[in-house]
Amino acid sequence: MDAEIFSLDSLSIYKDINIASAKPSLKERKNIKHYALDHLNIDEKNNAQLFKTLLEDAMRVSSKEILLIVGGSSFYLKSILEGLSDTPKISGEEVVKIEREISALANPYAFLKSIDPTIAFKIHPNDTYRIHKALEIFYLTHMPPSEYFKANPKKPFEHAISLFALHIEKNALHNNIKQRTKNMLHSGLVEEIKALYAKYPKDSQPFKAIGVKESVLFLEKQLTLKELEGAITFNPIKLAKRQNTFNKTQFNILYTGSVKEVRHAILKHSKSAY
């Protein structure tokens, strides 16, 4: 397949996280152009707006007929496709100040409910990501988020994107995850995270990711090596199940099948589109 790849992955976007993200090696990237890899430092934040900007840049410069958007950040993909509101540009110092304000809240959801019942009603109390994003808007603009979004409506994504999903039999998927965990540990996952955890702020976004957060717990002696391997195996299995449900219910997927079948479907679809 003559294509380029856009990585919609919230861990591969970071420099220096290579093992935990199972990022393609430089050798694997040599003949195939990849976008949105190694873009951020560990102490920088990723979000849907950043991925949208990078995706639009990639679409503009890609020389291939096919640009494959690959990765597991389905929530970001949904946000991009449905449209995003413009958010004000802020400095690193302002980000730190806002993070401190939010961290100081005893109950972020209760506070959001008190300043903006309308937006709080639309967010589940356990949806920490969306609660956090709403509070960021409030502290940044001093407006209730619902009013801000009314004044700054979502801008739909201007490009047509066809969605394909891989189907992997449950036992095969679980075995793949178990083997990947062993490979990561053997390749130096703990050493990779140890070096980064010593260098960057402990509340950096990547340290909350699956595979990374468990390694941090091991480094803090809260997990044994056996428990670490079990956690890095079990948590991705749970995540894969959630992602599968999310993808089925939130997207209009054109085709689902094996790697070979999806490859054939993409080629067939791309030919009919031109």
From Swiss-Prot:
> Could you say which EC number(s) this protein's record lists?
2.5.1.75
> What organism, scientifically named, is this protein from?
Helicobacter pylori (strain P12)
Spell out the protein name for this chain.
Answer: tRNA dimethylallyltransferase
Biological process terms in GO annotation: tRNA modification
Q: Where is this region: Interaction with substrate tRNA?
A: 9-12
Q: What is the lineage of its organism?
A: Bacteria, Pseudomonadati, Campylobacterota, Epsilonproteobacteria, Campylobacterales
User: Which reaction(s) does the protein catalyse, per the Swiss-Prot or TrEMBL entry?
Assistant: adenosine(37) in tRNA + dimethylallyl diphosphate = N(6)-dimethylallyladenosine(37) in tRNA + diphosphate
Say if the entry is tagged with keyword Transmembrane helix: no
The feature of type site (Interaction with substrate tRNA) is located at S73
MF term (GO), any: tRNA dimethylallyltransferase activity
